[in-house]
């Protein structure tokens, strides 16, 4: 596992998105609670999925899956009670942190259970990169979910056929 401090773009993106989505962290310094575990290896150009890990398992009432349909793509937050946290970002080629995460995990980094020593210092984000994040969130919207009404299902009717 690796410190979130090593990926300042992703850390800033994560903080801003989670704030907009209504998630509240007890500790504002989420970089001291969540660690980079790995990234998705699907190799799709529009996938920017990152897997995180928390030393302390999540409370049962905070676990689950939330799907956010945004004007910039889909973001799926999947929190598991074992301490894993999946931040799945799909269908948008310009997530500001994608290159940073790809580069970070492209160095043949091992996936291990060793939790790194905490450091408060976060790598500084360049003005250019901060502008990318600002531009991304400037017109960012969480849209109403796309729901398809399939009508009612009569489970009694299904049981009769079996």
Q: What do these predicted ranges mean?
A:
Residues 45-101:
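Amphipathic protein-protein interaction modules
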Residues 1-63, 99-162:
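N-terminal domain-onset segments
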């Amino acid at each position: 596992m690796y410190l979130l401090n090593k990926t300042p773009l992703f850390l800033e993106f994560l903080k801003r998105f989670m704030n907009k989505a209504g998630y509240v962290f007890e500790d504002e310094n989420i970089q001291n609670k969540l660690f980079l575990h790995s990234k998705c290896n699907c190799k799709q150009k529009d996938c920017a999925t990152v897997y995180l890990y928390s030393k302390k398992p999540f409370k049962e009432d905070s676990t689950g899956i939330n799907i956010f349909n945004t004007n910039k793509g889909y973001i799926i937050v999947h929190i598991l009670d074992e301490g894993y946290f999946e931040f799945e970002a799909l269908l948008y080629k310009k997530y500001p942190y994608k290159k940073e995460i790809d580069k970070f995990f492209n160095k043949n980094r091992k996936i291990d259970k060793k939790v790194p020593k905490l450091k408060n210092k976060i790598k500084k984000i360049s003005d250019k990169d901060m502008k990318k994040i600002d531009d991304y969130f400037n017109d960012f919207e969480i849209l109403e979910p796309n729901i398809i009404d399939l009508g009612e299902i009569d489970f009694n009717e299904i049981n009769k056929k079996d």
